[in-house]
Regions:
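Cleft-lining beta-strand/loop regions that shape enzyme active-site pockets
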Residues: 49-50, 54-58, 82-84, 95, ...
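Conserved functional hotspot residues or short segments at active or partner-binding sites
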Residues: 363-383
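A generic structural motif
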Residues: 105, 165-169, 363
Length: 383
């Protein structure tokens, strides 16, 4: 009410609610005579016009409320990716961005707090450390900023500079750190222990959790466009030391990512047959992703896949396919249960926002002639 004072006016609220009720009651009639798309456009135009008269809320606020409300009626994974969220969405799928390479969050009192610099990034080499508080960006105070505000100001074109004013517990005075923005690679693959950082800024991993018995370890934190290539690079590093006698693939707390990447990684361990299929709400098969024998580079390696309640979507495809084909042993806890496919559509010609719409469900490969399981969470299910 402080931000939008008209919301505290009871007369205006009642008038607004009456208008919304009228539109809702009229909707079935309009749909009988006009196409659904045209009906909704006309309704939205009337609502926006009424808002100008009654509540006078910013158009962006109203559109977001109606947009999020509409998507919430579908399922938990269908959503609008708004302009202020699109950058983070793109980063999660592309696996890279331009910036200085710091992970930040909002502190207990609203300050912009550094969680950690990314290995090999400008922030890493520039002296930023965990628990630093960013008080200014290019001289502008961060007081009252959200994390998104800070990201907007800190990121920019590659090769340009940004000055962060840092408050550090071990220093009496603030520090000004000028960093040059660069392309930051978000690695989704790591080993058992980070031994050092290379001259190019890449972490050097110890890939053997048990050197004596030659048991390798690879942790995968997401399924981005670069994850498959990163796993192949890790495998080459393993083999340079010696041929492994087994591999642990750690998918704990991996929320998933890109379906094609899940298929590629599954195929490393599976020589033939289905990896995952997709079906619509009627149970009709829409696709069947299958393994290629010439890409099953690791099919002969003994494999253990670690999962927990934080393993979802693409993680469940990989672990489920490995289990169905007997290509490895699954160890851990019941996974999250996110077995739906979202297709992404641009909103508008300039694609400043996106719509994620659930269109399919995953089905794992059949086991012993029985139909494969749907991955999607079901109330009361124990598997």
């Amino acid at each position: 009410a402080e931000t939008f004072p008209n919301l505290s006016d009871e007369v205006r609220r009642e008038k607004w609610q009456a208008m919304i009720d009228t539109e809702e009651e009229s909707l079935p009639h309009y749909l009988q005579h006009v196409s659904g798309h045209k009906t909704l456009i006309n309704m939205l135009e009337r609502i926006l016009a009424a808002n100008e008269e009654i509540l006078q809320l910013p158009k962006t606020v109203l559109l977001r409320e109606f947009g999020d409300g509409a998507m919430s009626k579908l399922d938990r994974y269908s959503a609008i990716v708004w302009p202020n969220e699109k950058r983070q969405f793109d980063q999660s799928t592309e696996g890279n961005f331009v910036g200085v390479g710091i992970v930040i969050r909002e502190g207990n009192t609203g300050e912009i707090l550094v969680v950690s610099p990314i290995d090999g990034s400008p922030a890493y080499y520039g002296g930023v450390v965990p628990e630093d508080i960013i008080t200014h960006v290019n001289g502008s105070s961060t007081s009252g900023w959200t994390v998104n505000d800070a990201v907007d100001k800190i990121t920019g074109k590659r090769g340009t500079s940004v000055t962060l004013t840092i408050k550090r517990e071990t220093e009496e005075e603030s520090l000004d750190l000028t960093l040059t923005r660069d392309r930051i690679i978000l690695r989704s693959v790591s080993g058992w222990n980070k031994k050092s950082i290379s001259e190019s800024g890449e972490p050097i991993w110890d890939w053997y959790i048990d050197p004596h018995n030659h048991i390798g370890y690879i942790k995968l934190t997401g399924f981005s466009k670069s994850s498959y290539a990163d796993i192949l690079a890790a495998i080459r590093d393993l083999q340079e030391i010696g041929e492994p006698n087994g591999l642990i693939l750690d998918l704990r707390y991996n929320p998933g990512g890109l379906l094609p990447t899940a298929r590629q990684i599954s195929n490393l361990f599976i020589q033939e047959g289905s990896i995952v299929s997709g079906e619509n709400a009627n149970g009709d098969m829409l696709f069947d992703m299958r393994a290629y024998e010439n890409r099953a580079y690791l099919a002969d390696w003994p494999l253990v896949v670690l999962i927990n309640q934080g393993s979802a979507s693409a993680s469940e495809i990989v672990s489920g396919a490995v289990q169905a084909h007997g290509a490895g042993i699954i160890v851990g806890q019941r996974s999250w249960g996110k077995g739906s496919v979202q297709t992404v559509h641009n909103l508008g010609a300039d694609a400043l926002a996106l719509v994620k719409l659930t269109t399919q469900l995953y089905r794992l490969p059949a086991i012993d002639g029985k139909p494969g399981r749907l991955v999607h969470k079901r109330e009361g299910s124990s598997d």
